[in-house]
Design a protein with these regions (language model features):
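Acyl-donor (CoA/ACP) binding surface of acyl/acetyltransferases
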Residues: 1-36, 63-172
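Conserved GNAT-fold acetyl-CoA-binding loop/helix
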Residues: 34-54
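A short helix-loop-beta-strand connector motif used in the catalytic cores of GNAT acetyltransferases and
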Residues: 54-65
Length: 172
C-alpha cells in the first residue's frame, strides 16, 4: 500500500492518485485552517507547494486525492505513510466546504479498510492533537483508540486502529 491506490469508490467519493492538474485545487483546499494543524505544510500553501507535495508522493509517503462522486472536484487529501516495519500512519485534510458532511469519515474509513485488507497484520496509526476534537471523533468513529502515548509530532497523541470483530456475541 505504499503504492498509490489505483481507485477506491464509496457512495459519495472517489479516491484516486493526485494528478499534476490538481495543484491549483490542492492549494485552494489547503487553507490556514489546514496549515495551522499540519506541521509539514507551509503557510500560505501555494500551487508550487502543491506540486512539490505531489512530486514527493511515492515510496513511503503517498498522498491520495479524495474527489466527489463524479471524480471531478478535489475535496480532500489522505496520506498513507510507511513507518517502521509493518506500521502505517494515516493523515488527512479536507476542504472547508465538505467538513461536517461525513465525506471525511467515509473516505478515511475506505482507505484504512483497504490498507488493512492489503497488508494483513499491519498496524495502522494516526497522530491527533488533543484539541482537534473533530478529527479525534472521526478517528474514533472508524475504530481508532487512544494509545496514551505521545506522537512523534509536537503536541500530538498517538491513536491506533482496531478492526471491528467479524462477529458479535450477544449475552442475554
Amino acid at each position: 500500500m505504499t503504492d498509490t491506490l489505483l481507485a477506491l469508490s464509496t457512495d459519495h467519493c472517489r479516491i484516486t492518485p493526485l494528478f499534476a492538474d490538481d495543484a491549483r485545487a490542492l492549494a485552494a483546499i489547503t487553507d490556514e485552517t489546514v496549515t495551522s494543524r499540519v506541521h509539514f505544510l507551509p503557510a500560505p500553501f501555494t500551487e508550487a507547494d502543491a506540486r512539490a507535495l505531489m512530486a514527493g508522493s511515492g515510496g513511503g509517503d503517498v498522498f491520495h486525492a479524495v474527489r466527489d462522486a463524479r471524480g471531478l472536484d478535489l475535496n480532500g487529501v489522505i496520506g498513507v505513510h510507511r513507518r517502521v516495519g509493518q506500521e502505517y500512519e494515516i493523515g488527512y485534510w479536507f476542504a472547508a466546504r465538505v467538513r461536517g458532511k461525513g465525506i471525511a469519515t467515509e473516505a478515511v474509513r475506505a482507505v484504512v479498510e483497504a490498507l488493512a485488507a492489503s497488508r494483513p497484520g499491519c498496524s495502522i496509526v494516526a497522530e491527533c492533537h488533543p484539541d482537534n476534537e473533530r478529527s479525534r471523533a472521526l478517528l474514533r468513529r472508524i475504530g481508532f483508540v487512544s494509545t496514551g502515548r505521545a506522537g512523534k509530532r509536537p503536541g500530538r497523541m498517538l491513536m491506533a486502529w482496531r478492526a471491528a470483530p467479524a462477529y458479535r456475541i450477544d449475552v442475554c
